[in-house]
Amino acid sequence: MLGFVGRVAATSASGALRGLGPSPLPQVKVLLRASPAALQSARDYATQTSPSPKAGAATGRIVAVIGAVVDVQFDEGLPPILNALEVQGRETRLVLEVAQHLGESTVRTIAMDGTEGLVRGQKVLDSGAPIKIPVGPETLGRIMNVIGEPIDERGPIKTKQFAAIHAEAPEFVEMSVEQEILVTGIKVVDLLAPYAKGGKIGLFGGAGVGKTVLIMELINNVAKAHGGYSVFAGVGERTREGNDLYHEMIESGVINLKDATSKVALVYGQMNEPPGARARVALTGLTVAEYFRDQEGQDVLLFIDNIFRFTQAGSEVSALLGRIPSAVGYQPTLATDMGTMQERITTTKKGSITSVQAIYVPADDLTDPAPATTFAHLDATTVLSRAIAELGIYPAVDPLDSTSRIMDPNIVGNEHYDVARGVQKILQDYKSLQDIIAILGMDELSEEDKLTVSRARKIQRFLSQPFQVAEVFTGHMGKLVPLKETIKGFQQILAGEYDHLPEQAFYMVGPIEEAVAKADKLAEEHSATQTSPSPKGAAAXXXRVV
């Protein structure tokens, strides 16, 4: 049976190739002519009631269906590469994207949804443009799929603005060359691995270490501190996680179902979707973010979870199109596909898109082509550590593994740089002393090393912070700490100004003043228990003496 299917596929492919004529060169010319027409600038926003095909658009018919690949024949008006086609006579909307030209009249397309029920001879209409999706403030608080359809059961997205998902990166003259920190209000991030406005951040973390909570806090803080919007693109991840994230955002107030104060737009193409949808959903999310940057001058936060799935889907599409695979089975256009998307994530003179990308590393192999290609584009890495999460320190960001390209005295200033490096040095010294402490105990350390350990433990606890989106779980009121307060607090701990305070005073507080207030409160509670011990406490003390 498999052999028969293989022969049918091979016959279909060879039949298509026969249409190319004696030389494949004309096909290359067609591709090169078609591409610029299909790529439309993200700054050209069409105003229309819906992205319906144009009147009098070219009509074709399906001639072959091989899984997610559909071949469509046009008698005239061959659609350019990347154009969106719509299959007629179906209850649900099925969009096909032109990927290749086979001969003079046939195009090979990738389906954006399941191809179940398709038959040869079915009519297909050319939309005359790439896939267009709704953009604008009306998308906030809503969930859409790769082709811009709402999937949150809350009716249509009422916007007149539509934009093509394929666009050129901003021109050099439009880009801003100023390096600027995006202050997140999260102490450990702002101090040790600051995010650059318009930068790309890789978020590494396993299950249960707080990736989702960190993402939600970043969305919340950017909305409150900068008035900015966020876009979350779920690329090839679990549907359950996407559903959980949506409901957690409603509970924490990031999404408001009652009015128009939502601060985030969600775009989902989960792992049950065909490869075409997973390969394009990141571009759909990016297009929504580009509107807020270019038309409203916003500093937008774009979350992509997971960028590896974008590459994985591209690999599947490439194999379906019959391209010869490159290293480790990835598509030969891996670097091009990644670069085309990543170059659109940048700062312009109007606004910025700062991207936080969760990265799955296959088999923990950082040399795998997929993560290795992503690393080339990253400006900062935020590593979430299970060992730190086990200590109860949240956010569980590893202060020694997390890095940032803008951690440079010329960008962040000498004071910030010196404090950050001082914090990392003392934490590294503490890490190297832990083996000695485990074997010989604290008493065997020199006075200088004891002081290092004491300050490092205070710094470690001061790197924790109560999150506003986690108030309902922790009972601690969330804190957003300005960068100046963060630098001042760590500077004073390093200088030894708080050597007299107990280390538990530094746990789960905002600025340093709260640690001092907490220490005073702990001292009062301690003195109160000393002066008036309870009868049970006195009895227990007597029992211990005996």
UniProtKB/Swiss-Prot annotation:
Q: What is its EC number?
A: 7.1.2.2
Q: Which domain of life is it from?
A: Eukaryota
Kindly state which reaction or reactions the protein catalyses.
ATP + H2O + 4 H(+)(in) = ADP + phosphate + 5 H(+)(out)
Q: Which SMART domains match?
A: AAA
Phosphoserine: residues carrying this PTM: 432
Please give the residue positions where the record annotates the modification N6-acetyllysine. Answer: 123, 132, 160, 197, 258, 263, 425, 479, 484, 521
Binding residues annotated for ADP, in chain numbering: 208-213
Membrane topology classification: Peripheral membrane protein
Question: Can you tell me which residues bind phosphate?
Answer: 208-212
Q: Transit peptide span? A: 1-45
Major place of residence = mitochondrion
Q: Which residues bind Mg(2+) 2?
A: 237
Q: Does Protease appear among the keywords?
A: no
UniProt key word Cytoplasm: no
- What keywords are annotated for this sequence in UniProt? Acetylation, ATP synthesis, ATP-binding, CF(1), Hydrogen ion transport, Ion transport, Magnesium, Membrane, Metal-binding, Mitochondrion, Mitochondrion inner membrane, Nucleotide-binding, Phosphoprotein, Transit peptide, Translocase, Transport
Q: Where does Mg(2+) 1 bind?
A: 212
* Enzyme superclass (EC): translocase
InterPro entries per the record? AAA+_ATPase (IPR003593), ATP-synt_VA_C (IPR055190), ATP_synth_F1_bsu (IPR005722), ATPase_a/bsu_AS (IPR020003), ATPase_alpha/beta_chains (IPR050053), ATPase_F1/V1/A1_a/bsu_N (IPR004100), ATPase_F1/V1/A1_a/bsu_N_sf (IPR036121), ATPase_F1/V1/A1_a/bsu_nucl-bd (IPR000194)
Q: Which residues does ATP bind?
A: 208, 210-213, 238
Q: So what family is this one in?
A: Belongs to the ATPase alpha/beta chains family.
Summarizing the function annotation, the protein's role is:
Catalytic subunit beta, of the mitochondrial membrane ATP synthase complex (F(1)F(0) ATP synthase or Complex V) that produces ATP from ADP in the presence of a proton gradient across the membrane which is generated by electron transport complexes of the respiratory chain. ATP synthase complex consist of a soluble F(1) head domain - the catalytic core - and a membrane F(1) domain - the membrane proton channel. These two domains are linked by a central stalk rotating inside the F(1) region and a stationary peripheral stalk.
> How does the record describe its quaternary structure?
Homotrimer. Component of the ATP synthase complex composed at least of ATP5F1A/subunit alpha, ATP5F1B/subunit beta, ATP5MC1/subunit c (homooctomer), MT-ATP6/subunit a, MT-ATP8/subunit 8, ATP5ME/subunit e, ATP5MF/subunit f, ATP5MG/subunit g, ATP5MK/subunit k, ATP5MJ/subunit j, ATP5F1C/subunit gamma, ATP5F1D/subunit delta, ATP5F1E/subunit epsilon, ATP5PF/subunit F6, ATP5PB/subunit b, ATP5PD/subunit d, ATP5PO/subunit OSCP.
Protein's UniProt name: ATP synthase F(1) complex catalytic subunit beta, mitochondrial
Protein source organism: Canis lupus familiaris (Dog)
The gene designation is ATP5F1B
